[in-house]
Amino acid sequence: MNVENQDPNIMVIPNNNLGPIDGNNISPAMNDENSNNGSSFLKNLVNTGTNLLFSSSSSIASPPNLGGLSNDSTNNNSNSNNTIDSSKPLSFENDMSDGYEALVRRSEIAIDQCKELLDFFKKRASEEEKYSKNISNMFSKFKVKDDHDTFQKGVSLLNKINDAESTIHRSFSQNITTNLYHPLNEAIKDMEKSRKRLLEDGKKLKNDLKDSIENVKKSNQKYEKLCREMEQAKLELIEEGNDTKSGKVETLEKKLEKTKLASIKAEDEYKEQINETNEFISGVYQNRLSENLREFQQFELTRLEIMKSNIRNYIGFMKDIPQALQCEIDSTKGFVDIIDPEVDLQNYIMNNSNPKKVLLPFIFEAYNDHKPFVDQHNQNSSSSSSTNALNYASPMSASGSITNTITSQSGSTIISNGASQPIEIPSPQPISEQQQIPPQQQQQQQQAQVPPTSINQSSSPPVNPMGRQQSLKENIFGFFNKATTNLKSSTSSLLTKDGNSTTSSNTSTSNSNQLSKSGIGLPIINTNSIFGVELEVLIENDNSKKKGNGVELEVPLILTQFVQALLKLESFKMDGVFVSLPSHFNIQQEKQKLDQTGTLENITDVYLIASLFKNWIGDLPNPLISYAIYQEIIEAPDNAWKIIESGIPILHRRVLHYIIDFLVDFVNCSKMDTHSISLIFTPVLIRSPFNGDSLLNSKKEVAVIENMIIDSLETKRGNYILKRNLPIIPDDENSDDDDDDSGHIDDENNSSTSGENDINTTNINNNNNVNSNNDTNNNNNNSNTTTTNNNNNNDSNNSNSTNNNNNNNNNNTNNDDNESNNSGYGVSSNGNNINSSVGGSVTHHFLYQTTPTNNVTPVLSDFFDTNSSNGSSKANTNTHNLGVRNSSNISFDTISTNQSDSEPVLVEYDNDDFDILSYK
């Protein structure tokens, strides 16, 4: 476009973004360069307005020269802002370099700092309150019990000081809460409201500036558009100007005139909008922004003053604490002298004085003087096996306590049994040579004078009738020599209930009658007592209650009741049945009830029964594993059973075997392992006689019990496999051994019949891939038979029948002597105990019988089937060939329960494991 042909009325927009804008120098753009310059101007204008809002107050005070403002004034203001007058105080309005956005961030951080201080005051007040209560509670329960005790008065002085200190800290806590926490909390709320209002005002001011700049932009765009339309109409008119005859020229002229008027109007509007924006920035915007900055500055000053005041007050409260405490301590200094140790000692001696007593000296008494305590049957018996053993199964008294004999200075004998007052028996006067009494009469007189005392199986010394000097271990704890001969004799004397045993019992009864006639009183013992009672007393009381049944218990009745209850309640399915303990009060209450009733019928809590079971074992006066073998057994835990067989009385062995076998089955059927069950039962089964070594030997004690359980577990597993898979080889002349080369028994009919006075041997046959029908019949005129049939589903028909006859384990008998089989007790008939000659030990076997009341009854029976008519037993089984352990073995092999009045069902399992506690 030629400049010469340009319309003088059209103005050109100057190519400067922030230069002055007026109507004299505005002209429409005639090319692309001018159009781009116009767009660049609008962009710079918007950016400038945005920077104005977030720039410093000095920049806002000197905005760009958008109209009417000269460049010189702008430069002067800029130079003045770069120089700060140090003589004047700085302010947010004039000297803030970060602007409005920095103030917003600072106010947010300031509120957070106030909240942190508020939280500190709250926690400190809470801690002071707790400390005050703890101090006051230290001596809150202390009361002066003796007004004459000066030391107690001194302690009360400490209580007074603590109360004073507690009051001081309580006051400090209240001051923090009342004078610091609550006022600061209200101030923070007010500051948050003020900050919110300031932020809203700043946001509104920013929006107003943005709207004003947006209006300038719109008016500029409208103005440029109309200018371009006018230029276009002018070009079209020039092109058509050569053709004067055409009517189009007139139309173009009218269009040009119209666009010219519109562009002039848009130009006026554009100038007016620029003036309004400049006035807003320099007037309203500047004033409102300055006011907002001043309020922010006042907000910060107020906040800092509040923080300073609270910190000063807190320090002042802290200074008051030691001063107040020092005053309290100074006021009580003189009261410390009230404590007079000499006066306290004199008052105590005066109130507890008693005359001086001199103890009588002890006098030695020879060991032979204890011979009157020995059973008369053991002195007069002609059998060497009977004279070398002491019958522990028939205790001579019901007390079951340790008997000590001391000779007083007057020559009388004092017998103390631990359960009653000492009994003093006058000693016989010296007899002259002319008045000598025959030895037999002397013996009778001595028996009449000496009361029948209980021979403690684990602590009192048994007497050697042959006069042999025994070792210290035997004399103190009353155990036999480990020699095989003596152990055989003791076992024979205990298990054979013959005429000699009756004589011993009669002798004990006669001695008791003589003692009653002599006027010497014995302590009255509750026959239902269970806890803290010797095993001998328990078994004697149980047998006396069942005296009319003609049977004697092998273990205490309460032990079988504990096991029955635990099995019936399925304790092996419970978690932590022996670990979870009821409250101590409940245990003590149930122990008192049991001592009165003697039965567990009303207890259904399996955890309570388990706790009572452990308490009963632990309360035994003498532990099951005696003190006599303690050191020996903890040094050799692998030989625990061997040491026990020759080291503790037979009744203790029976009970120990019974408990260990129960634990074996419990471990096998529960989730508990042998080590865990050993840790639980070790403290009640074995006790250290030395208090100092109890902790040092605890691991050794656990190892002993664990080895015993493992040995019983392995023995039981071996016995079960032998009973299931191996034939028992009889040594009877009438028996036939028909084994073929393959190890199977292929006889079509293999039967073995013995007489009434012989023990029948049970043949257990493996019927795998064999066509046979093996029947073993044991004839006994006094019992019926119980049949257990195991049928294997093979290609052939196999039938194994094992008929076992035992007078003790039969529920289908018609004899009156076996009424106890329906009573739920563990019994053994007289004359039917096995006397084993292997290693001097006895092998027992506990089976389970059921009654119509769903009781599971352990019955002590022979490990192998026996049949005896005259009290003597003959074993037809070679235990060496079977590899059976030579020890007393009690097991829970077969368990059955009767859910109705029908016959009991014996359960036998085909897996390799043994004895599964199950109910069918």
UniProtKB/Swiss-Prot annotation:
GO terms for cellular component: contractile vacuolar membrane; contractile vacuole; cytoplasm; cytosol; vesicle. Residues 533-716 form the Rho-GAP domain. The record marks V579 as: Arginine finger. Residues 65-87, 403-449, 490-513, 757-836 have a biased composition (Low complexity). Residues 450-468 have a biased composition (Polar residues). It comes from the Eukaryota. Keywords: Coiled coil, Cytoplasm, GTPase activation, Vacuole. SUPFAM superfamilies: BAR/IMD domain-like, GTPase activation domain, GAP. PROSITE patterns: F_BAR, RHOGAP. GO terms for biological process: actin filament polymerization; contractile vacuole discharge; contractile vacuole organization; exocytosis; hypotonic response; negative regulation of filopodium assembly; phototaxis; response to differentiation-inducing factor 1. Residues 90-344 form the F-BAR domain. Its main location: cytoplasm. This is GTPase activating protein homolog 1. The lineage of its organism: Eukaryota, Amoebozoa, Evosea, Eumycetozoa, Dictyostelia. The gene is mgp1.
